């Protein structure tokens, strides 16, 4: 018969492993809030898949939708006080709710995100414009850049972001825009045909084509293969920026 001391030390050895197992299983997940002001199922799927593909499964995604912000911007023709205040309030609410980083998806509100950079730095909760790194990459890759959008309110903020990036990089760029009017909400094949038609001439004189809206991302490879030009869409760049922010905070490895 085995001694009591043998049984005691065997149980003690097993028990000593339990705290480490519990810590590993209950490790807090990094919280990533994604802020939308307009959505489609395709848009949400592309953005959230890009974030999950870039990061491990050990994150918690929180989606925030506030369509009134976009509607007010379109109605007023610019980002007025009311939509800007709503946007800021949603960001602060996510901070209070424990978000570690907030990803801003809508291009029409990019100027608000830029204006809030000092506040987000003070809060310690990065507010990431999904277009920021895409625009940086576009400037790296060429000097003749075409911005494509289905909403006119998305074009101006993207242009200003491109201008900032070109200044930071000491590079002169030429930016033109293409508005694919009526393109938002179309089925995939109809939209791809419309994009092919609208971009045939601009593609010839472009080094880089960037899509101003996440809802257009699924069409990027099609246009790239069709015209042999560099085509950038923002979901993967936004996801990489989220990863960099979480790494900087020491929340992931």
Model-derived features: where do they sit?
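Bacterial N-terminal signal peptides that target proteins for export
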Residues: 1-8
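Bacterial N-terminal signal peptides
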Residues: 8-19
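Non-catalytic structural scaffold of enzyme domains
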Residues: 20, 24-253
């Amino acid at each position: 018969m085995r001694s009591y001391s043998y049984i005691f030390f065997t149980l003690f050895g097993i028990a000593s492993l339990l705290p480490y197992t519990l810590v590993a299983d209950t490790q807090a997940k990094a919280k990533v809030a994604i802020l939308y002001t307009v959505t489609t199922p395709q848009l949400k799927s592309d953005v959230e898949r890009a974030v999950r593909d870039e990061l491990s499964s050990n994150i918690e995604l929180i989606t925030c939708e506030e369509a009134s912000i976009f509607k007010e911007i379109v109605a007023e023709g610019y980002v007025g006080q009311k939509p800007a205040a709503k946007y800021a309030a949603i960001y602060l609410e996510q901070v209070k709710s424990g978000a570690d980083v907030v990803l801003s998806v809508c291009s029409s509100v990019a100027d608000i995100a830029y204006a809030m950079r000092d506040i987000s730095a003070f809060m310690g909760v990065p507010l990431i414009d999904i277009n920021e790194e895409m625009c940086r990459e576009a400037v790296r890759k060429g000097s003749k850049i075409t911005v494509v959008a289905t909403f006119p309110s998305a074009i101006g903020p993207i242009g200003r972001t491109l201008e900032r990036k070109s200044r930071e990089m000491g590079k002169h760029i030429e930016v033109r825009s293409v508005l694919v009017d009526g393109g938002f909400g179309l089925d995939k094949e109809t939209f791809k045909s419309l994009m092919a038609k609208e971009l045939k001439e601009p593609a010839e004189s472009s080094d880089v084509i960037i899509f101003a809206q996440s809802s257009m991302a699924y069409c990027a490879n099609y246009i790239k293969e069709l015209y042999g030009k560099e085509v950038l869409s923002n979901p993967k760049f936004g996801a990489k920026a989220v990863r960099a922010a979480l790494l900087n905070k020491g929340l992931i490895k």
